[in-house]
Amino acid sequence: MSDFLAYLTSAPSRPHGSANITDKCYDHQLRDLIAYLKQPGVAPSTADINGYLEAISPAVHSLSYLYLLRIRIQQLQEKTAVGVPNDLQPGGTLWNQTVKFLRSFDPIQIRYVGHEWRELVDSVANAALSVSKPILAVKMIRDALERLNTAGVFTSLHLMLVKLALLSSSYTYVLPVLDKLLCHFPSDTQNAHAGILLCSEHEPSTVFFTDSSGFSANLTYRDHLQFYMYSGMVYMALKKWDQASHCLGIVISAPTANSVSKIMVEAYKKWVLANLLGHGKLFSVPNLVAPHVTRVYQSLSKPYISLAEAFEKRDFQRLRTEISLGQTIWRADKNSGLVYQVFEAYDKFLIIKLGKTFSALTMPDVLQRASSCSKGSRDIEEFVVSLVMTKELRAKLSHSPGNETTTMLRFPLSSQSHALREEHIRFRLIQKEAALNTISRAITQTKITLETSHENLQVIAKNQKLAGSSERSGVVGSTEADGGGDLDEDLMGDGR
């Protein structure tokens, strides 16, 4: 046991013993440990594994701990002939050990075993689903992704996480992951020729998440659309309408040749409702959407367009009629709840609109001005109070001097609203700056990747040969010397 334990602890994480060795030496240590653990016959017996798991730390010896966990899961699966043994279910010993690992693993060591790490995360999801408690997996997978830090790379685990969040209605738990910009797909071209060591601490994290690293299953075009569709649904459940509109806008803006997919049409319908609920009106589709695609969306979503028109024109009777006529459609599209919220939001936007015209109104005046409001005289004051308390309506309530029975609704002065707008704009600018910085770093990394790609190096080598040949023959033209003459031909030629 002592010899095997010595191997398990031969490559501790850098903060716990390997801080002073070079990247190259540490890379050799980790690869040697992996090679040893993969040898046939090295796996310890069932009785010994729990002892080893108690003896080593998942934070210090993450590679070894993950290896032992996977061996133990395989042994139990073979013994019980079930996919999720009782010991792996929530509350079991193996579940608790897995929780401990996913909350403390060393992300640098895990770069070497992405496939095995993802399999363990999949096991966690299956275990939670087997007892109908997906919320337990949501917390663990979220923490694991945060710890791993995928640095803006979209993986299959992101899609799994948002699906589990919708299943368990645990929407707020996934916001730390959903709020991060995703700018990359896993790709091998980023480090195919760079010779980057996986243990390097100074390289951008994006180079470690490739389609061969194992951190993600194979991704399809549909996976990308589904992720943003489900993300939009999460934001809608939290009434974060702007974020929902953004995610759904990504889906409806996806490139398409001749026709749109079903998921894109579904996203458009929800996008219409998100705009009505967030801003009380229907915005134009993003500029990336071609005009003919917009026409397809509108033709396939006519009940939603009619609903939006009635809402924008503040035609209450028509709105009720459109909602009633479309009951079957709302249910089939699973949008009944959202349409009901649109109906409830009608009064809110009617009253908010009054603030653009008046500085103060009594409650009877509010009811009179909002003539199509569905509230009665007794309900209107309670409704306005709720809007003010939830900060959906920027206004104050007070009693008129000498008349304590009449409530006055006072809208903010232009100077106050201007200050609020400035604060909102400042906050948005900070958000946009952070997003632009992320995109800028991604562009820089992409530029470096393209410059060191196999295709570009071939072009440079060919152009250098052509330049040398031209110099020897004494006919060096500026275009040929720079390699510009054959650049397009080379890129389009062999296609390698």
Swiss-Prot record:
A Pfam family per the record: COP9_hel_rpt
InterPro entries xref list: COP9_N (IPR055089), CSN3 (IPR050756), PCI_dom (IPR000717)
Keyword Nucleus among UniProt keywords: yes
GO CC annotation: COP9 signalosome; cytoplasm
BP-aspect Gene Ontology terms: cleistothecium development; ubiquitin-dependent protein catabolic process
Coiled-coil features, chain-numbered ranges: none
Record field: compositional bias (Acidic residues): 483-496
Subunit structure of this chain's protein: Component of the COP9 signalosome (CSN) complex.
Function (record text): Component of the COP9 signalosome (CSN) complex that acts as an regulator of the ubiquitin (Ubl) conjugation pathway by mediating the deneddylation of the cullin subunit of SCF-type E3 ubiquitin-protein ligase complexes. The CSN complex seems to link protein degradation to sexual development.
Protein name: COP9 signalosome complex subunit 3
Organism per entry: Emericella nidulans (strain FGSC A4 / ATCC 38163 / CBS 112.46 / NRRL 194 / M139)
UniProt gene name: csnC
